[in-house]
C-alpha cells in the first residue's frame, strides 16, 4: 500500500485573502460542502479572531460539515486560541492551527521578540491549546527564511508540547524545489521527535513554484500538503490543489503515494469556487482551464482521434468533464432536464431550486437553439448562490449610438413598490448602472467589471461579473443573459442584493424604498 498524502484545503482561509475576494457565510458553507464531496482531509475554515463574520463562518462549518477535519487559524495568544476553540468545539474533528514567525527578519521587525522568547511562546501556546483541542497544528511563519538550527529547536519544542502537525510554510514563495526538498529532509534528520508529528507544507506561488515545491516536499517525506482550489491566495496565490492531486495520481509511478480525493469532483469544485469568488480561471490553466483538454493542432487532433494517450496523459472524465449524450432544447421536459443535472453531478438540489433552474432553462431555450452544459452550469450556479431579492430588475431600456449620449431607463421593484429612473452614461452598461444606483438609492464604487462568453456560436450567453465596494467591503456577483446589457444589469442588481443581504440579513425590514 502506498503512503497517503493528506490534502489540507485552505481555500476558505488563505484563498479568501486573494485581492478583491470576499465571501459571506453562505458562500463559505456552500464551498465547504463541495470540499466535503471532493473528499479533502482537512478544511481550514477561517481565522475566527479576525472578524465576527469569520468566527460565525467557522462555527457554522464546524457544526455542519462531517468527515474532514475542520481547522481554525490562531495567532500564538490565548485570546486567539480561546476564540478559535469556541468556534470549533461543535466539530467532530476540530483542529487549532497556531502560527508564529521564526525568521530573524520577522522576529526583529514584526514581533519585536528575541529568539528565546519566540521559542517559549510557541511551546507555551501549543501546550495551552492542546488542553482545549485534541488536534493542534503549528506553523513557524516564514520557515524557509528561518535559521535551520533555530527552526529545529522550535519544531522539537512544539512537538513535545503536543503539536500533532508541524507545517513548514514558504510564506513568501522564495524557495526552489531542490532547496525545499533538502529543507524537509533536514527537518526529518535533525528534529529528534519528528516521527511524533505529521510534516505539512504550505507553498506560495510568487515565483510560480508552489506546486513544484510541494511535490518536492512530498518526495522528501512530507505527509500533508496545504493548497487551495484554483491556486487562490495572497499575491500570486497558493499551490493549486487540483494540480498537486492530479500530479500524484498521474505520476503514481514516480511519487509512490496517493490521496483520497474524488478526482471526478475537481472540475465542479473549481467552477463553484470561480463563480463564488468572481476569479476567472485562465484558459490555459492546468487541469481545470477551458483549454486543458483542447487540441487545435491538426497533428495533435489526428493523434488523439486514433489513440487518446498520444497527447492526453489523463482523461477529461478523470477530473469530472463528462460528454453530453442528451441534447436539451425548448421541447425538453423536466424529467430529462433533471436526469441531465444528475449526470453533471447536481444530485442534491432541492425541488424548489430545481424548479427555478428548469424555469430559467425554458426561458433560455426560447432565446437559444442550442443549450450547452456551460449554459446549464451557469444557470445552476446563479441559483445556488442566489440571495433574497430585495431589489428586482423588472425592466430596462437603453438608447445608444456612436453619435448620441447613451441613456438607460430602468424599473426596479422593492418591497412591492416600483421605482423608475433614467440616467446617462459612458455607454449603455454605464448608463444602466447609474440608473440602478438612482433607483435603489445606493452609493457604491464599481471595482471590477468583466464578461465572458458561455457556450459558443452567435447565440452564446454572456456572463458578467461585477465587484462593487461600500465602506471598504467588496461584494461580487454575476449575471447571465443572451443580452450583454441585461446580463450587466442583473449582475449589478445581484451585487446590490448581496450587499443588503449581508448588511441587513437579521432584519430585512430595514430596507425601504424611499
Curated annotation (Swiss-Prot):
Cofactor(s) listed in the protein's UniProt record: Mn(2+)
A biological process term (GO) from this entry: L-leucine biosynthetic process
Tell me which UniProt keywords the record has, alphabetically: Amino-acid biosynthesis, Branched-chain amino acid biosynthesis, Cytoplasm, Leucine biosynthesis, Manganese, Metal-binding, Transferase
| Domain of life the protein comes from | Bacteria
The annotated region (Regulatory domain) lies at 392-514
Which CDD domains does the entry mention? DRE_TIM_IPMS
* GO annotations of cellular component type: cytoplasm
Q: Where in the cell is it found?
A: Cytoplasm
Q: Which EC main class describes this enzyme? A: transferase
Task: Check the record and name the InterPro entries matching this protein.
Answer: 2-IPM_HCS-like, 2-isopropylmalate_synth_dimer, AIPM/Hcit_synth_CS, Aldolase_TIM, LeuA/HCS_post-cat, LeuA_allosteric_dom_sf, LeuA_bact_synth, PYR_CT
> Which residues participate in Mn(2+) binding?
14, 202, 204, 238
Domain Pyruvate carboxyltransferase residues, every copy: 5-267
Question: Where does it mainly reside?
Answer: cytoplasm
Which EC numbers characterise this protein's activity in its record? 2.3.3.13
State the family it belongs to.
Answer: Belongs to the alpha-IPM synthase/homocitrate synthase family. LeuA type 1 subfamily.
> Assembly and interactions?
Homodimer.
Q: What is the protein name stated in its UniProt record?
A: 2-isopropylmalate synthase
Species, as recorded:
Clostridium kluyveri (strain ATCC 8527 / DSM 555 / NBRC 12016 / NCIMB 10680 / K1)
Gene from which this protein is expressed: leuA
Amino acid at each position: 500500500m502506498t503512503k497517503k498524502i493528506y490534502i489540507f484545503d485552505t481555500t476558505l482561509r488563505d484563498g479568501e485573502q486573494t485581492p478583491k475576494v470576499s465571501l459571506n457565510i453562505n458562500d463559505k458553507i456552500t464551498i465547504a460542502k463541495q470540499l466535503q464531496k471532493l473528499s479533502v482531509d482537512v478544511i481550514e475554515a477561517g481565522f475566527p479572531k479576525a472578524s465576527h463574520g469569520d468566527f460565525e463562518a467557522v462555527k457554522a462549518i464546524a457544526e455542519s460539515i462531517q468527515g474532514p477535519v475542520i481547522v481554525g487559524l490562531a495567532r500564538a495568544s490565548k485570546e486567539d486560541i480561546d476564540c478559535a476553540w469556541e468556534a470549533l468545539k461543535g466539530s467532530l474533528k476540530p483542529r487549532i492551527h497556531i502560527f508564529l514567525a521564526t525568521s530573524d527578519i520577522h522576529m526583529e521587525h514584526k514581533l519585536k521578540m528575541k529568539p528565546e522568547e519566540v521559542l517559549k511562546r510557541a511551546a507555551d501556546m501549543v501546550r495551552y491549546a492542546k488542553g482545549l483541542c485534541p488536534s493542534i497544528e503549528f506553523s513557524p511563519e516564514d520557515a524557509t527564511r528561518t535559521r535551520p538550527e533555530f527552526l529545529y529547536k522550535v519544531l522539537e519544542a512544539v512537538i513535545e508540547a503536543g503539536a500533532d502537525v508541524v507545517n513548514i510554510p514558504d510564506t513568501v514563495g522564495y524557495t526552489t524545489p531542490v532547496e525545499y526538498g533538502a529543507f524537509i529532509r533536514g527537518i526529518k534528520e535533525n528534529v529528534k521527535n519528528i516521527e511524533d508529528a505529521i510534516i505539512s507544507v504550505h507553498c506560495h506561488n510568487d515565483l510560480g513554484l508552489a506546486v513544484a515545491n510541494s511535490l518536492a516536499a512530498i518526495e522528501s517525506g512530507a505527509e500533508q500538503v496545504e493548497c487551495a482550489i484554483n491556486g487562490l491566495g495572497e499575491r500570486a496565490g497558493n499551490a493549486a490543489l487540483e494540480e498537486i492531486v492530479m500530479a500524484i495520481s498521474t505520476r503514481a509511478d514516480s511519487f509512490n503515494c496517493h490521496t483520497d480525493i474524488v478526482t471526478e469532483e475537481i472540475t465542479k469544485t473549481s467552477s463553484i469556487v470561480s463563480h463564488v469568488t468572481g476569479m476567472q480561471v485562465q484558459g490555459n490553466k492546468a487541469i481545470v482551464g477551458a483549454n486543458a483538454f483542447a487540441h487545435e493542432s491538426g497533428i495533435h487532433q489526428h493523434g488523439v482521434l486514433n489513440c487518446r494517450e498520444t497527447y492526453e496523459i489523463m482523461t477529461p472524465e478523470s477530473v469530472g468533464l463528462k460528454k453530453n449524450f442528451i441534447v436539451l432544447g425548448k421541447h425538453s421536459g423536466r424529467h430529462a432536464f433533471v436526469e441531465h443535472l444528475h449526470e453533471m453531478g447536481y444530485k442534491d438540489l432541492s425541488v424548489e431550486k430545481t424548479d427555478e433552474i428548469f424555469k430559467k432553462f425554458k426561458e433560455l431555450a426560447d432565446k437559444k437553439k442550442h443549450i450547452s452544459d456551460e449554459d446549464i452550469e451557469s444557470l445552476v450556479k446563479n441559483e445556488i448562490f442566489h440571495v433574497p431579492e430585495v431589489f428586482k430588475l423588472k425592466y430596462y431600456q437603453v438608447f445608444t449610438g456612436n453619435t448620441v449620449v447613451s441613456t438607460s431607463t430602468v424599473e426596479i421593484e422593492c418591497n412591492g413598490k416600483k421605482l423608475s429612473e433614467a440616467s446617462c452614461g459612458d455607454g449603455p452598461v454605464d448608463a444602466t448602472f447609474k440608473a440602478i444606483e438612482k433607483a435603489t438609492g445606493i452609493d457604491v464604487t464599481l471595482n471590477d467589471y468583466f464578461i465572458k462568453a458561455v457556450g459558443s456560436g452567435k447565440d452564446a450567453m454572456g456572463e458578467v461579473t461585477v465587484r462593487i465596494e461600500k465602506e471598504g467591503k467588496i461584494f461580487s456577483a454575476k449575471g447571465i443573459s443572451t443580452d450583454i446589457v441585461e446580463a450587466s444589469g442583473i449582475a449589478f442588481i445581484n451585487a446590490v442584493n448581496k450587499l443588503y443581504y449581508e448588511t441587513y440579513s437579521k432584519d430585512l425590514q430595514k430596507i425601504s424604498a424611499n
